[in-house]
């Protein structure tokens, strides 16, 4: 690994935009720009694979948030998870996010 690079990890990102007229597109684009690959099978949540740290991802997203919005970025791992998703969704997560 070169200096400044970070090993790619999986993160779950969840946000609530609480002001009327919020620009979801800017928040969504900032999340996508932080990711090597991503999926969003939920409202206001993304599972991404990124070579950025949680702090660096947050730094890309927070300029698009208001003070009453909420954001959490949590590192996810491939050894302890569960959910109710379709087979194709699980396949994508296993191969692209955790793979």
List the predicted regions and their residue ranges.
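Functionally constrained cores in energy, signaling, and assembly domains
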Residues: 9, 30, 34, 58, ...
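Amphipathic alpha-helical interface surfaces
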Residues: 23, 27, 53, 57-61, ...
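Short, intrinsically disordered low-complexity segments
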Residues: 37-78
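Short, Lys/Arg-enriched N-terminal segments with co-localized hydrophobic residues
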Residues: 1-6
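Generic structural "secondary-structure junction" signal
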Residues: 19, 40, 48, 83-87
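C-terminal structural segments of small proteins and small subunits
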Residues: 67-99
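N-terminal first-folded block
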Residues: 9-40
């Amino acid at each position: 690994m070169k200096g400044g690079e970070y090993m790619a990890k999986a993160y779950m990102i969840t946000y609530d935009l609480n002001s009327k007229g919020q620009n979801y597109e800017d928040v969504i684009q900032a999340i996508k720009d932080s990711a090597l690959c991503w999926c969003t099978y939920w409202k206001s949540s993304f599972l991404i694979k990124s070579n950025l740290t949680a702090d660096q991802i947050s730094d890309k997203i927070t300029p698009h948030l208001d003070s009453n919005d909420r954001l959490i970025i949590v590192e996810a791992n491939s050894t302890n998870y569960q959910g109710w998703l379709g087979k194709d969704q699980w396949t994508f997560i296993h191969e692209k996010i955790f793979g």
